[in-house]
A protein has these predicted regions:
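Domain-length cofactor-binding catalytic modules of enzymes
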Residues: 1-130
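C-terminal helical/tail subdomains of lipid-metabolizing enzymes
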Residues: 94, 139, 143-144, 154, ...
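Intrinsically disordered or highly flexible coil/loop and linker segments, enriched in small
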Residues: 104-111, 146, 161-167
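Intrinsic disorder at enzyme termini
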Residues: 122-145
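Extended, highly charged clamp/arch subdomains and adjacent linkers
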Residues: 157-159
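Conserved small/polar residues in nucleotide/adenosyl-binding loops
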Residues: 168-175
């Protein structure tokens, strides 16, 4: 996942949220560093089937006017380069991405459409005072098509763990990435 992506609409935002994953830490069961799915970062806290939880957010979206629905963004502070190091400096510099999101919602900056959502133009990020090599910026916003095809298959398997529930709307976004 790139450093930041804007959902194309509410349903796409629910799709993005339903597919959040993170590396396990010492505080979570399983192998430290292993990637695990944690929809909406709510899996340990949700007291009912996640499919119903996804359905709730889709229903909320149906009640929103298109022009007034909140914008949804997903961030990836922890993307690693091919050498295993973090590409983004993180910590206080994350505010630079939040600044871009605020300017995006205010209509001050535009985006590039991609198969996974709307991406910022790198020149619209405030990078004053930090040294992020051009190659790292390119990798931060690159989309590996083959990896996304694999991810789409894993997403299908993940959704299936919640039982025989129709994810027509969410699965429509999944196929766009292929």
């Amino acid at each position: 996942m790139p450093l930041v992506v804007e959902a194309t609409d509410w349903t796409h935002g629910v799709f993005l949220g339903s597919n959040i994953s993170s590396e396990r830490t010492a505080a979570a069961e399983g192998t430290v560093g292993e990637l695990r799915r944690d929809p909406f970062a709510m899996l340990p806290f949700c007291g009912y089937n996640m499919a119903d939880y996804f359905g709730h957010w889709l229903k909320v979206g149906r009640g929103l006017r298109f022009d007034r629905a909140p914008r949804i963004f997903q961030v990836n502070w922890f993307r690693r380069g091919s050498d295993g190091r973090f590409l983004w400096p993180g910590f206080g510099d994350n505010s630079r991405v939040v600044d871009w999101i605020i300017r995006r919602v205010s209509g001050e900056v535009s985006t590039i459409d991609s198969p996974i959502g709307r991406l910022p133009l790198v020149e619209d990020l405030n990078l004053d005072g930090i040294d992020v090599p051009e190659a790292d910026l390119e990798e931060l916003f690159s989309i590996d098509t083959e990896a996304w095809k694999t991810e789409a298959d894993l997403t299908e398997e993940f959704y299936d763990t919640f039982g025989a529930v129709s994810y027509t709307h969410l699965r429509a976004h999944e196929t766009k990435a292929n």
